[in-house]
Amino acid sequence: MVSEAPPFWWTKADWRAYALWPFSWVYGRIAGMRMDRARRATSAVPLICIGNFTVGGAGKTPTAIAIARAARARGLKPAFLSRGYGGSLDVTTVVDPEHHRARDVGDEPLLLAREALTVICRRRVDGARKLAAEGADIIIMDDGFQSARLVFDFALLVVDSGRGIGNGHLVPSGPVRAPIGNQLRHANALLKLGHGSAADPLVRRAARAGKPVYVAETVRTDAGSLDGVKVLAWAGIADPEKFFKTVRETGAVIEETRSFPDHHHFSEDEIADLIDRAASRGYTLVTTAKDMVRLEPGHGRAGELAAKSRVIEIEVRFDDPAAPGKIIDAALASARARRLRERKAG
């Protein structure tokens, strides 16, 4: 089981956040120095990093998919690089969605592999080499912005408009992964995702630092009406309330919800409880695509839960349809300039 982020991270800072501040100060110093001073390897092909400021989800994976689709539309061969968080494999692996399970490679890589070539690797440098050898001509890295292992040709940081950066404190006082100033210094642009004002102070700070700010929203893409349907909504993601809000926007009537930790692997008892609870009350089960890939058909009642659950499919849609192309063009230009510098230095 993957542990959950403390709820107090996402509310106004209280005594718990301030009690942990000395540890956050040390953590921030180390994280900031690592980002600024680490020696980074270069990728043989252009590399775009989709990251975020905080621990947990902000919409990185659907954003990465949107960029990949735009790259493919331009005739490029995009590929994804992921650490494979939540999976057990610790070797460089090309993800096969027909063969691998979430327990092997992680749930997000399985989603990415449905779109394009995907490699998981504990050492992202090795993963980038593998993707180049496999014929990718642009790499999209899902997360890993703070790891300071690779040179990014473009780094896009996603911030959720509803959550922002929580209480604004660094781990463990809050969800922020490294000092905001250090993160902005290594970012090329921000993506403000969704509706709400929680991200506005950060957006203004980024704009003052000269960083472009793109705007996008998540839109539902699955077919079929849920208007008036009584549902039991279940999700094991970083922000389940965001999913439940999406379900309500479909017109569904949420009678019950079940929340699990992000990347959670469901037990037989949990699966049985969801199935039996919905059946006894006549509710329709609804969940996310990320949760669905963690179910293992053929293992106990997991296949039954998968068959009885409706997936709310979403995608990221930029307000400016040209924005993904601008990001790709900037990454390609940066990579060309980087290679020219490398040749001159060599």
UniProtKB/Swiss-Prot annotation:
The keyword Zinc-finger does not apply. It comes from the Bacteria. InterPro entries: LpxK (IPR003758), P-loop_NTPase (IPR027417). Pfam families: LpxK. GO terms for biological process: lipid A biosynthetic process; lipopolysaccharide core region biosynthetic process. GO terms for cellular component: plasma membrane. It catalyses: a lipid A disaccharide + ATP = a lipid IVA + ADP + H(+). ATP binds at residues 54-61. Disulfide bonds: none annotated. Its EC number is 2.7.1.130. Pathway: Glycolipid biosynthesis; lipid IV(A) biosynthesis; lipid IV(A) from (3R)-3-hydroxytetradecanoyl-[acyl-carrier-protein] and UDP-N-acetyl-alpha-D-glucosamine: step 6/6. GO terms for molecular function: ATP binding; tetraacyldisaccharide 4'-kinase activity. Keywords: ATP-binding, Kinase, Lipid A biosynthesis, Lipid biosynthesis, Lipid metabolism, Nucleotide-binding, Transferase. Belongs to the LpxK family. HAMAP family: LpxK (MF_00409). Transfers the gamma-phosphate of ATP to the 4'-position of a tetraacyldisaccharide 1-phosphate intermediate (termed DS-1-P) to form tetraacyldisaccharide 1,4'-bis-phosphate (lipid IVA). This is Tetraacyldisaccharide 4'-kinase.
